[in-house]
């Protein structure tokens, strides 16, 4: 039984079952600001033991994952030993896509909202500048920058092809710890 449900869309937890075993935390519609542009959106979730309360370290997660609602409805999920991919079939069931996520040792993609670059700390700016310098820069190879503005869409691509997703802290009010909400999105 689910003891409580935490949503990025609500100010307080919804208590469901006294003595429940787990807490479910989610961002139920990540990327919703992009609906009118037809960009993939999705759901981010985390399942935690109820005994630890709602604010506990991510290492305590029992399972976590993302659903992506786009040209395909897909699910990436982990229960702590690997990340697995599933696709919603025409029968209404999720089917194993036949691959376990393995991040490549090297990649040439990164996702960051470059429109915020004027607010970044110097180390972040240097890292991105090094990537953008391509083969002529200190990393001596070309990189591709991607940014959809939907964590689930950017995350799916990173998990599928490798890379890094960055939403760093910056100098704007309210962004001193980055933008991802730890309980719901990290």
Question: Where in the sequence are the language-model features?
Answer:
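An extended, acidic
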Residues: 65-186
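DPxDG-like acidic metal-binding loop motif
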Residues: 19-81
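Gly/Ser/Thr-rich phosphate-binding loop
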Residues: 2-3, 29, 155
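Short, flexible, glycine/charge-rich loop motifs used to bind or transfer phosphoryl groups or to couple energy/partner
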Residues: 12-15, 54-55, 155
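N-terminal assembly/interaction segments in proteins that build large macromolecular machines
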Residues: 1-24
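Short secondary-structure capping/junction motifs at helix and strand boundaries
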Residues: 2-8, 53-54, 75, 84
């Amino acid at each position: 039984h689910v003891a409580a449900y935490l949503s990025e869309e609500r100010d307080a937890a919804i208590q469901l079952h006294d003595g429940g075993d787990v807490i479910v935390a989610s961002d139920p519609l990540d990327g919703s600001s992009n609906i009118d542009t037809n960009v993939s959106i999705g759901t981010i979730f985390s399942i935690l033991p109820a005994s630890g309360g709602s604010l506990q370290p991510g290492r305590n997660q029992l399972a976590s994952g993302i659903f992506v609602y786009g040209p395909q409805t897909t699910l990436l999920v982990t229960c702590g030993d690997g990340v697995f991919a599933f696709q919603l079939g025409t029968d209404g069931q999720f089917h194993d896509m036949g691959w376990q996520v393995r991040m490549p040792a090297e990649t040439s993609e990164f996702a960051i909202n470059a429109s915020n670059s004027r607010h970044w700390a110097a180390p972040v700016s240097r890292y991105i500048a090094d990537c953008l310098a391509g083969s002529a820069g200190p990393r001596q190879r070309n990189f591709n920058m991607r940014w959809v503005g939907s964590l689930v869409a950017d995350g799916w691509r990173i998990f599928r092809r490798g890379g890094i997703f960055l939403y760093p802290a910056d100098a704007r009010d309210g962004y001193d710890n980055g933008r991802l909400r730890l309980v719901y999105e990290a």
